[in-house]
Amino acid sequence: MRIPWLEADTPFPPAEQALKEPNGLLAAGGELNTDRLRAAYAKGIFPWYSEGEPLLWWSPDPRMVLACADFAPSHSLRKTLRRLARAEQAGDTRIQVRVDTAFARVMAACAGRRDGQAGTWITPEVQAAYCAWHEQGQAHSIETWIDDHLVGGLYGISLGGMFFGESMFAHATDASKIALAYLVAFLTRHEVDWIDCQQQTRHLASLGARPLPRAQFLQHVARVLAKPAPPWRVGVLRHAGDIVDSANQR
């Protein structure tokens, strides 16, 4: 079965027309710019392709989603989070979770080669497009820092009452999971219920994510896009889910 080739002004086909094999492949072509990306995410569609391939657009069924209420940190991660909360109360800033202070660096780290992977979908073109989206205030990074060194984090898209997770990395134990836990606290504080995880992995399932029928996912996205987005800003993200200026974190 063939998929449509998109020109710059071609609208996306309905997500329901995506192929079953490969699961979710919907269309190819078009442009990778913020307007196009915004239109895609609003319809439950995302780009995913390797360098040298055409621009490919996907909407898999089922869709992996982490409900914030279902976030399930391991016993060891819960201990780490409690320790970080105590350190925060004591004014210890050795380990911090920050928001939007190093978006491009987080993307570059997520694009790094990993075991078992021949390449990355986070190509220079993708990095440029999402950094432009970050400048417009809708792409965000959650970053784990130790002694002012970036050691882990994640990035994603905030549209209305929905957060679309993109990728994460860790150069220290649990560094990406700490960032995710603080993101969950922030989103919960601002009544954002779901994080889109796009595709199924055992790692995400271990943290509480589960596959949902695409139709259910699309209905939820359509319902919450009109909600106001959380009040993102550059700063330190605390365990309670509030963002403060680094000078005022105590």
Swiss-Prot record:
CC annotations in GO: cytoplasm
Catalysed conversion reaction: N-terminal L-lysyl-[protein] + L-leucyl-tRNA(Leu) = N-terminal L-leucyl-L-lysyl-[protein] + tRNA(Leu) + H(+); N-terminal L-arginyl-[protein] + L-leucyl-tRNA(Leu) = N-terminal L-leucyl-L-arginyl-[protein] + tRNA(Leu) + H(+); L-phenylalanyl-tRNA(Phe) + an N-terminal L-alpha-aminoacyl-[protein] = an N-terminal L-phenylalanyl-L-alpha-aminoacyl-[protein] + tRNA(Phe)
UniProt cross-references to Pfam families, sorted A to Z: Leu_Phe_trans
Subcellular location per the Swiss-Prot or TrEMBL entry: Cytoplasm
Superkingdom in the source lineage: Bacteria
Stored InterPro entries: Acyl_CoA_acyltransferase, Leu/Phe-tRNA_Trfase, Leu/Phe-tRNA_Trfase_C, Leu/Phe-tRNA_Trfase_N
Entry keyword set: Acyltransferase, Cytoplasm, Transferase
One GO BP annotation of this record: protein catabolic process
Keyword Translocase: no
The enzyme's E.C. designation: 2.3.2.6
Keyword Membrane among record annotations: no
Function summary: Functions in the N-end rule pathway of protein degradation where it conjugates Leu, Phe and, less efficiently, Met from aminoacyl-tRNAs to the N-termini of proteins containing an N-terminal arginine or lysine.
Family the entry assigns: Belongs to the L/F-transferase family.
UniProt name for this protein: Leucyl/phenylalanyl-tRNA--protein transferase
Organism field: Bordetella avium (strain 197N)
Gene: aat
